[in-house]
Amino acid sequence: MSLALGHGTIAGSTAAPLSEEGEVTSGLQALAVEDTGGPSVSASKAEEEGKGSQEEAGREGSRPEEALEAPSAASDERAEGEAEDWCVPCSDEEVELPANGQSWMPPPSEIQRLYELLATQGTLELQAEILPRRPPTPEAQSEEERSDEEPEAKEEEEEKPHMPTEFDFDDEPMTPKDSLIDRRRTPGSSARSQKREARLDKVLSDMKRHKKLEEQILRTGRDLFSLDSEGPSPTSPPLRSSGNSLFPRQRKY
């Protein structure tokens, strides 16, 4: 029993350091794993970033390809639509084919004759019925031209004098015009009115006459040509000129 216990104690004492060594080794291994894991993680991150950049570059490269494919597809659709709408119209000969389906051809003898004429004369006479030409159709007038012509026509109508006809009746009495009245003229007088002319001798004579009248007024205090036609009464005092004005009252010639 003692041996067993002793052995057990030895084993227990030896087991304790072994367990401590195991812990140390496991800790070292963990540290080693952590040390080795650092670069591996950075490498994995770098790989992921490289893959992301490659994917972005691939997307950017695919965008112009898609942009090029889109107009090409649109052009293909347009070409298909034009191909469906495109057609060649038939010629007059194809439309006006005879019942048997063969186009008209001159006989060989006529072709030979025409070639011989070309060889000898050089030209062929044109045998065709010349139809008369019709006059050109008048162009439709625009609204502006019509509006310009209308006022001109109205002005012409207004300018035309009214011509009297046998169907014109004047129901209202007309007042006689002065020109229609027979004026009595003195014998020897002309129908035309005399034109007044200004002469120097007449002007000078008028000035002398007015000067004499003014002297008469200043001397007598009375105007020869009074306003009222009646003569002056003997009881009325003579008019005297005031100092402010030469003429006491206006003369009437």
UniProtKB/Swiss-Prot annotation:
Q: Which residues form a coiled coil?
A: none
Key words, A-Z: DNA damage, DNA recombination, DNA repair, Nucleus, Phosphoprotein, Transcription, Transcription regulation
Which effects follow disruption of this gene?
A: Normal germ layer specification and developmental patterning but limited anterior development and arrest by 8.5 dpc, likely due at least in part to defects in extraembryonic tissue.
- Keyword Nucleus, does the record have it? yes
Residue ranges of region Sufficient for interaction with NCOA1? Answer: 115-159
Q: List where Polar residues composition bias occurs.
A: 238-247
Q: Which residues carry this modification: Phosphothreonine?
A: 137
> Which is a GO BP term held by this UniProt record?
chorion development
Q: Which PANTHER family match?
A: PAXIP1-ASSOCIATED GLUTAMATE-RICH PROTEIN 1
Q: What does the subunit section of this Swiss-Prot or TrEMBL entry state?
A: Component of the KMT2 family MLL2/MLL3 complex, at least composed of the histone methyltransferases KMT2D and/or KMT2C, the common subunits ASH2L, RBBP5, WDR5 and DPY30, and the complex type-specific subunits PAXIP1/PTIP, PAGR1, NCOA6 and KDM6A; PAXIP1 is required for the association with the MLL2/MLL3 complex. Forms a constitutive complex with PAXIP1/PTIP independently of the MLL2/MLL3 complex. Interacts with NCOA1, ESR1, NR3C1, AR.
Its biological function? Its association with the histone methyltransferase MLL2/MLL3 complex is suggesting a role in epigenetic transcriptional activation. However, in association with PAXIP1/PTIP is proposed to function at least in part independently of the MLL2/MLL3 complex. Proposed to be recruited by PAXIP1 to sites of DNA damage where the PAGR1:PAXIP1 complex is required for cell survival in response to DNA damage independently of the MLL2/MLL3 complex. However, its function in DNA damage has been questioned.
Its recorded name reads PAXIP1-associated glutamate-rich protein 1A
Gene encoding the protein: Pagr1a
